[in-house]
């Protein structure tokens, strides 16, 4: 994701100016507390953007813009960070902030549908309809409310979060759905950022609270979703979230066939309908067909079509391996085929062949956030470590942690933030953000994971887009 606005722009700190092949600034943690202290310093900085209301708390950096409630870059994502702080530290103060943030989200999720708010989200990304989706829209708020209901299950607040999440579900089933040839849909884009993510939210809602009628709705939406897959002349089936009228195709997780395959795997898991498993396999065939060999392994290009086709390889969550690796990981739990572990190994090899995580490249520019950089990579490789205990995955995640610590900017008051380039095509423009996918909240959450890993008590409850075990294999 590369939006055009820049919040609190800064001159590049030493080591964070972009150059291909250049090493990122790094600092190796001496003990587990280094990770926790960095995360707590980030919390102090995020807290400076806190706004109290009678209905709860929201966080906002730029008062001239509409309040961003999204999971991706707004208040719901910051509330999710406070949930994680609560789970890791047990702090009553952080628990109260999480509750207040969730309460505000529960009361105001419909604000994302207001014309000014919807235009703000859609125009910022240049993708009409993202305000309806999961990451940047209503569904993402719902996912965080589900997590809040789980974390605070023994609290009276849990019922409030459950009711709000179910209201969001009814918004999707009763208000905003359109009728297609075989079932309901919303934006017409299969991307996980759009309709694919809405369906993941509905699956999470069904599995958390139970509702047979909702399951039948999901089945109908799944039948419609299959219509968006097209036989590719390259091989396999392609779900192009960029849109059928665009001259290019994004194959990776949040927009492309990797994300669609991931959703289809979940649809197979909850319905048992073998059509979904077969089409998910065909998505993998497409990804295999467009993968580009590296000195070691393979990588999927950021984009198919255009002058830079097959030349730029993102390594983060949205268009890169940190997201795409989730597809073969989930498939490996459902389909007894060695191709899935092979795919994981090849993509990891390809990333290291480009110099990751220590060195900058066209697809890992001077950025460290959860969406595009090291925070998202560390999270995914920690997840892989939870599956098989491979020292390789743990070491890769720790190396990413070195970059997160090394690129941190500490302020005079002891708080900390991360200046980095949001836009790949403008690496000279740095900003410091608070969001989960695009800023300090997500980076600090990954640091909490590394803290628990080093303390040998790793436990990470996961959202539905996150297929890894909650704890390492013992």
Question: Residue ranges of each PLM-predicted region?
Answer:
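Glycan-recognition and catalytic cores of secretory/periplasmic carbohydrate-active enzymes
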Residues: 1-474
């Amino acid at each position: 994701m590369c939006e055009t606005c820049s919040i609190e722009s800064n001159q590049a700190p030493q080591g964070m100016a972009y150059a291909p092949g250049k090493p990122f600034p790094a600092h190796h943690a001496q003990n587990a507390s280094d990770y926790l202290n960095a995360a707590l310093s980030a919390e102090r900085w995020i807290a400076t953007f806190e706004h109290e209301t009678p209905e709860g708390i929201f966080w906002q950096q730029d008062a001239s813009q509409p309040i961003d409630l999204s999971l991706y870059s707004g208040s719901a994502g910051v509330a999710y960070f406070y949930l994680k702080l609560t789970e890791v530290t047990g702090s009553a103060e952080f628990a109260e902030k999480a509750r207040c943030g969730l309460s505000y989200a529960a009361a105001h999720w419909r604000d994302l549908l207001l014309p000014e708010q919807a235009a703000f989200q859609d125009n910022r990304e240049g993708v009409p309809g993202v305000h309806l989706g999961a990451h940047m829209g209503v569904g993402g708020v719902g996912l965080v409310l589900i997590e809040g209901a789980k974390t605070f299950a023994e609290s009276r607040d849990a019922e409030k979060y459950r009711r709000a999440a179910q209201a969001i579900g009814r918004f999707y089933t009763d208000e905003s759905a359109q009728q297609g040839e075989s079932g309901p849909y919303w934006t017409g884009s299969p991307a996980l950022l759009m309709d694919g993510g809405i369906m993941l939210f509905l699956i999470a809602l069904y599995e958390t609270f139970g509702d047979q009628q909702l399951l039948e709705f999901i089945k109908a939406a799944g039948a419609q979703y299959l219509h968006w897959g097209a036989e590719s002349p390259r091989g396999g089936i392609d779900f192009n979230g960029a849109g059928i009228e665009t001259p290019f195709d994004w194959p990776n997780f949040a927009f492309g066939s990797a994300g669609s395959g991931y959703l289809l795997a979940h649809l197979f898991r909850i319905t048992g309908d073998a059509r979904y498993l077969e089409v998910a396999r065909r998505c993998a065939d497409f990804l295999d067909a467009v993968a580009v060999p590296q000195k070691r392994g393979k990588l999927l290009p950021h984009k198919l079509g255009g002058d830079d086709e097959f030349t730029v390889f993102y390594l983060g969550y949205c268009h890169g391996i940190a997201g795409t690796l989730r597809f073969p990981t989930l498939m490996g739990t459902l389909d007894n085929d060695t191709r899935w572990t092979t795919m994981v190994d090849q993509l990891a090899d390809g990333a290291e062949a480009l110099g990751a995580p220590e060195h900058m490249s066209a697809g890992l520019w001077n950025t460290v956030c959860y969406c595009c950089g090291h925070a998202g990579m560390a999270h995914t490789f920690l997840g892989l470590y939870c599956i098989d205990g491979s020292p390789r995955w743990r070491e890769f995640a720790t190396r990413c942690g070195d970059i997160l610590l090394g690129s941190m900017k500490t302020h005079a008051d002891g708080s900390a933030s991360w200046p980095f380039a949001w836009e790949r095509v403008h690496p000279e423009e740095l900003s410091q953000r608070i969001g989960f996918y695009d800023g300090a909240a997500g980076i600090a959450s990954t640091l909490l994971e590394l803290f628990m890993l080093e303390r040998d008590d790793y436990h990470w409850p996961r959202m539905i887009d996150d297929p890894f075990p909650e704890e390492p294999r013992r």
